[in-house]
Amino acid sequence: MSEPKYKRILLKLSGEALAQGEQGFGVDPTRVHEIAAEIAEVHRLGVDIGVVVGGGNFFRGVAEQAKDMDRVSADHMGMLATVMNSLAVQDALEKQNVQCRVMSAIEIFQVAEPFIRRRAMRHLEKGRVVIFAAGTGNPYFSTDTAASLRAAEIKADVIMKATKVDGIYDADPHKVADATMFAQITYMDVLKKGLRVMDATAISLCQENRLPIVVFNLNERGNIQRVVMGEAVGSLVSA
């Protein structure tokens, strides 16, 4: 079997990926176990894996539901949502016999380790999957930005952003039938065109640190491994 193209990855999952259906709420155990099985397959290839999970299946600080709330309080609720999701993914991975640690950007000692970069690096070197919870630990920063930050900190080779579409399009493919998908695009073009890949802060952080981003469809079974092996899956964002 050929060698993986990427030796260390940061996988970004949306909270909605763990839920059932389009507008799913909460965690669907079957879906979480399907995702964990795919991560476990990649882990068995000897790839170092960091994971960042969003919290949108429980609460989103910038969403309509939070419009009358203080933004900082809303973002803190979103961070706690990511902790719940991280624990769900950890449990599913452990059932796949994958050693796993949740590291939280906010102190929550009873359920997760605090994020300490050197300790995270040690876990990865020991072959453990590390799930980074609670975003950056600061309000006003998205979990996409947290993914970019953690990827830079652990010296990941790539950020793999799992979505419900095949890649990056010039328009919403669910609304525009003839939307065109980009096989490859630069950071600057993503920013100039206002493409909703990640927020501008996350994209800029990747650009500064020369971190490629692969946007791919998580609903296509086996895509995580295909991306890791370097197959032409999804859209690549690079310099």
Curated annotation (Swiss-Prot):
It catalyses: UMP + ATP = UDP + ADP. Keywords: Allosteric enzyme, ATP-binding, Cytoplasm, Kinase, Nucleotide-binding, Pyrimidine biosynthesis, Transferase. Its EC number is 2.7.4.22. CDD domains: AAK_UMPK-PyrH-Ec. It holds the Pfam family AA_kinase. GO terms for cellular component: cytoplasm. GO terms for molecular function: ATP binding; UMP kinase activity. Pathway: Pyrimidine metabolism; CTP biosynthesis via de novo pathway; UDP from UMP (UMPK route): step 1/1. Residues 21-26 are annotated as: Involved in allosteric activation by GTP. It is found in: Cytoplasm. InterPro entries: AceGlu_kinase-like_sf, Asp/Glu/Uridylate_kinase, Uridylate_kinase, Uridylate_kinase_bac. ATP binds at K12, L13, S14, G15, G56, R60, T163, Y169, D172. GO terms for biological process: 'de novo' CTP biosynthetic process; UDP biosynthetic process. UMP binds at G55, D75, T136, G137, N138, P139, Y140, F141, S142, T143. The keyword ATP-binding applies. Allosterically activated by GTP. Inhibited by UTP. Its main location: cytoplasm. The keyword ATP-binding applies. Coiled coil: none annotated. It is an enzyme of class 2 (transferase). Catalyzes the reversible phosphorylation of UMP to UDP. HAMAP family: PyrH_B. Homohexamer. Belongs to the UMP kinase family. This is Uridylate kinase. It comes from Koribacter versatilis (strain Ellin345). The gene is pyrH.
